[in-house]
C-alpha cells in the first residue's frame, strides 16, 4: 500500500520535497504570498522515491515576519491518512467557501429588503453584518489575494470587528432600543481597533488582533445579555431564537479565544494535540447562525406583509360598506 505525507496546517505557504524530489506547493512565494493557513496538505510518497535506510522530507516554509508556523506531520498508509485529510479540507475549505457565497447572497437580499423598507434599519444593520462576515470569510478561503498580504489580513480582521458592531446595532433595532452614546462608543471602538491593528511598530499585530477580537466577544456577550433580559419578560417568540443564536456565537467564540491563547509551556503531547485540533469553530458557526437569522427575519417580514395586507383589506371592506 502506498504511503502519504499529511500536514495539518501551516502559515502561510510551503513547498514539499521527498528525498530531493518535488512533491508540490501551495502556490506563489513572492508577495502577495499564497495564503494556505486554513487548509491541510496531503501528498502521496511514490514508491520509486523511497530508499533503504533514512528518507528525507524537506518543507520550505514562507510567511510574513512573525506569522510562520508549522504543525507536526504524519507519514503513514494513504488509507489511514486520506480520510482525515478529506474531512478537514471539506470542513475548513469547501464548506466554508460554500457558506461564504451563500452568506454574501443572503446579505444582498437582506439589504434589498432594507432598500424597500428604509424606515426599518434592523435590515440594514443585519445585512451589513452578513456582508462583513462574508468579507472576513474570504480570508479563510482566498489563496491569492488581489492586494498585499498584510493589507488583506488587516482588512479581513477589521471586517470581523465591524461584524460585531453591526450585530450589536442590529440587536438594538430588533429590540427597539435607542442608546446613542453606546452606539457612538461602538463606532469609536471600531476606529480604535482599525488604528491599533494598523500599527505593527507599536504592538505585534497578532497581539493587537487578540485584544480587538476579545472586545468583539464582549460585544456579542453584551447583546446576548440584553436579549436574555427581554426574553425573561415572556416574549419568547420574538426574542428566544435570537438569544439562542447569540448564545451559539458566544460558545464558539469562547472556544476560539481559548484556542488562540499563547500556551507555550504545554507538555509536548498536549501541544501536539492542540496543534492538530487547531480548528476555528466560529468559521462555521457564525455563517450558519447568520443564515438561520436571515430565515427568521424573512419570516417576520412575511408576517408583517401579511398583517398589512389583511389590515388593508379590512379597511377597504369597511369603506365599501
List the model feature ranges, each with a label:
Residues 1-19, 57-59:
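Aromatic-lined ligand-binding clefts that engage carbohydrates, nucleic acids, or primary amines
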Residues 21-41:
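Solvent-exposed beta-strand/loop surfaces of large extracellular or lumenal domains
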Residues 24-26, 58, 64-79, 102-105, ...:
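Non-catalytic regulatory/interaction regions at protein termini and inter-domain linkers
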Residues 38-98:
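An acidic-aromatic loop/edge-strand motif
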Residues 86-117, 210-232, 287:
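First transmembrane helix
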Residues 102-113, 290-301, 319:
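Alpha-helical transmembrane signal-anchor helices
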Residues 132-314:
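Interfacial "cap-and-anchor" motif at the non-cytosolic start of specific transmembrane alpha-helices
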Residues 313-321:
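Cytosolic juxtamembrane regulatory segments of multi-pass membrane proteins
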Amino acid at each position: 500500500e502506498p504511503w502519504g505525507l499529511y500536514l495539518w496546517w501551516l502559515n502561510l505557504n510551503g513547498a514539499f520535497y521527498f528525498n530531493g524530489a518535488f512533491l508540490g506547493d501551495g502556490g506563489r512565494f513572492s508577495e502577495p504570498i499564497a495564503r494556505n493557513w486554513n487548509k491541510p496538505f496531503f501528498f502521496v510518497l511514490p514508491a520509486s522515491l523511497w530508499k533503504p535506510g533514512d528518507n528525507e522530507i524537506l518543507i520550505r516554509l514562507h510567511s510574513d515576519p512573525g506569522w510562520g508556523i508549522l504543525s507536526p506531520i504524519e507519514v503513514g498508509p494513504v488509507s489511514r491518512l486520506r480520510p482525515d485529510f478529506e474531512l478537514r479540507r471539506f470542513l475548513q475549505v469547501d464548506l466554508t467557501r460554500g457558506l461564504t457565497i451563500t452568506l454574501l447572497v443572503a446579505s444582498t437580499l437582506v439589504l434589498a429588503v432594507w432598500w424597500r423598507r428604509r424606515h426599518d434599519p434592523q435590515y440594514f444593520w443585519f445585512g451589513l453584518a452578513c456582508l462583513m462576515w462574508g468579507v472576513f470569510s474570504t480570508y479563510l478561503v482566498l489563496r491569492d489575494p488581489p492586494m498585499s498580504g498584510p493589507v488583506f489580513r488587516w482588512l479581513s480582521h477589521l471586517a470581523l470587528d465591524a461584524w460585531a458592531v453591526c450585530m450589536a446595532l442590529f440587536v438594538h433595532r430588533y429590540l427597539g432600543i435607542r442608546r446613542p452614546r453606546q452606539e457612538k462608543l461602538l463606532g469609536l471602538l471600531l476606529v480604535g481597533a482599525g488604528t491599533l491593528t494598523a500599527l505593527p511598530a507599536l504592538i505585534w499585530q497578532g497581539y493587537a488582533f487578540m485584544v480587538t477580537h476579545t472586545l468583539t466577544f464582549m460585544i456579542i456577550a453584551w447583546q446576548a445579555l440584553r436579549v436574555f433580559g427581554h426574553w425573561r419578560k415572556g416574549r419568547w417568540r420574538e426574542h428566544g431564537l435570537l438569544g439562542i443564536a447569540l448564545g451559539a456565537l458566544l460558545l464558539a467564540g469562547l472556544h476560539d479565544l481559548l484556542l488562540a491563547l499563547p500556551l507555550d509551556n504545554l507538555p509536548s503531547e498536549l501541544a501536539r494535540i492542540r496543534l492538530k485540533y487547531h480548528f476555528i469553530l466560529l468559521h462555521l458557526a457564525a455563517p450558519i447562525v447568520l443564515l438561520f437569522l436571515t430565515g427568521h427575519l424573512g419570516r417576520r417580514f412575511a408576517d408583517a406583509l401579511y398583517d398589512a395586507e389583511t389590515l388593508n383589506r379590512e379597511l377597504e371592506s369597511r369603506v365599501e360598506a
